[in-house]
Amino acid sequence: MSTDKKTLGEKPNSTKPELSEELIAELKKQRILEKNRPYKKMIYVDNKVQRKHRHENIAFLKTLHENKESDVPKKRRGRKPKHAPLKEKNNLKLFDILEGSLKSHIENDDTNTVINLLTEAWEKKSKKKQKNITLSNKEIISVLAKFELPEDEIIYVLDELRDKGIQLQHDVEEHIHEFRANQDLSIIDEDIEELTSKNISNRDKVDDNVRFFLGSLDFSKMLDFESEQRIAKVLNSTDEESRKYAINQLVTSNLRLVVSIAKKHLERGLDFNDLIQEGNLGLLKAISKFNWSLGNKFSTYATWWIKQAITRAIADQARTVRIPVHMVETINRLAKAERALYQELGREPTDEELAEKMGGQAEGFNVKKIAEIKRLSLDPVSLDKTVGHDEESQFGDFVKDTDAQTPDEFTESRSNSEKIDELLNNNLSEQEELIVRMRIGMPPYNEPKTLDEVGQKILIPREKIRQIENKAIRKLRHAVRNNPISMSFLRINEKKD
């Protein structure tokens, strides 16, 4: 692309440089006229051709920028025209767009910062007076990782470095392309570093085995689409060794993905090593179900199987008392509805409002059902849980035991038990005493027995047992009249067989 007068279509008396349709089409094709250029996968063609076109575009934009003030005549005094000529209006609009593009390409602070940082790194190396000093790919990527530069800005940075005489490695573009394609890995590395740091809470701390596993993830590199397709084809091979090799390649290349997904499910009841193991099982499930012929990327397909395996394990194993999976989904629906109503109403919703939000009676939700779901969603608290700032007290120290007796109550209860035992021994036969104790639930029996249960125990028909029981009760009532003691067990007629 050329910037001479013939190509520009410049007229002697024009206030703005006029662009030919061919040049405008070329600029649009290279996306210079777009303010926010969307990210596209970097395609490396001939770098010399790219640098040539880019320098021509920037040189042309600089020419427009320098001539902006000199070409525009002074404004005349008087009334302004209602409408500018259409041709001049289009030129002004296009000029403003090109000026904005010029600023984004030349005056980008992040771009200049990256260039300055890499130049300083090169100068520090040059002071050592070594031969064949080269700026390594690792040094370049470490600086680029701190800034979110678009594709064209990164290539512009490399061109500027080459123009300054800084030697770069021949495969720098390919390494940057790999870095851009695997940007998720940098986020995963930050997660892994956070997990292995000393600042995480006790609940999130991982044991030595998990630390060793996280430290050994350097060999886990995400595969590109072509490599995944090539390896996935081997999964259908009849050779057992080839299939094992393909499975091993897909597993090792996606271990970081498992760690990234597992970290998002911390603080939900399972240890981190358990989450990783469940995620690995989901990864193996994805490998067995993957169909390469559909053209999907394996990492995208495996993400859903890993998430399903982890969430299912949390639902089955995280709670002390297991809640069915369908009830866990209902609890999640209720929590989502509660958050939506809170944002809408600006207050905590009532159970009636939640029931209506969940579908009402048509879906089987009422106030009683909502209260039951809320009760199930509560996590059990350990009595040994430490409380307070000093963490010396336990939660169980503050829980009242409703079955506990005071010394006075214990003494009275013990005295009544002795008198009852004496009353039974003095007035009833062994068989009658046994039947009364079993029917009422007196020691050594902890709960009342039915007539059938008593009959099976002493091998007597239930009707006979009922007769013996009534006879024994009459004897006890007669004895109580002479020795008034509070005996609630004598109200046998209130019991139901």
UniProtKB/Swiss-Prot annotation:
Gene3D superfamilies: RNA Polymerase Primary Sigma Factor, Winged helix-like DNA-binding domain superfamily/Winged helix DNA-binding domain. It is found in: Cytoplasm. One of its GO terms (molecular function) is DNA binding. Residues 250-320 are annotated as: Sigma-70 factor domain-2. Residues 423-478 are annotated as: Sigma-70 factor domain-4. InterPro entries: RNA_pol_sigma-70_dom, RNA_pol_sigma70, RNA_pol_sigma70_r2, RNA_pol_sigma70_r3, RNA_pol_sigma70_r4, RNA_pol_sigma_r2, RNA_pol_sigma_r3/r4-like, RNA_pol_sigma_RpoD_C. It holds the Pfam family Sigma70_r2. Residues 1-20, 62-86 are annotated as: Disordered. A motif (Interaction with polymerase core subunit RpoC) lies at residues 274-277. Residues 329-410 are annotated as: Sigma-70 factor domain-3. Residues 74-84 have a biased composition (Basic residues). Its main location: cytoplasm. Residues 451-470 bind DNA. It comes from the Bacteria. Residues 63-73 have a biased composition (Basic and acidic residues). Keywords: Cytoplasm, DNA-binding, Sigma factor, Transcription, Transcription regulation. The keyword Ribosomal protein does not apply. GO terms for cellular component: cytoplasm. GO terms for biological process: DNA-templated transcription initiation. The keyword Transcription regulation applies. Belongs to the sigma-70 factor family. RpoD/SigA subfamily. Interacts transiently with the RNA polymerase catalytic core. Sigma factors are initiation factors that promote the attachment of RNA polymerase to specific initiation sites and are then released. This sigma factor is the primary sigma factor during exponential growth. This is RNA polymerase sigma factor SigA. It comes from Mycoplasma genitalium (strain ATCC 33530 / DSM 19775 / NCTC 10195 / G37). The lineage of its organism: Bacteria, Bacillati, Mycoplasmatota, Mycoplasmoidales, Mycoplasmoidaceae.
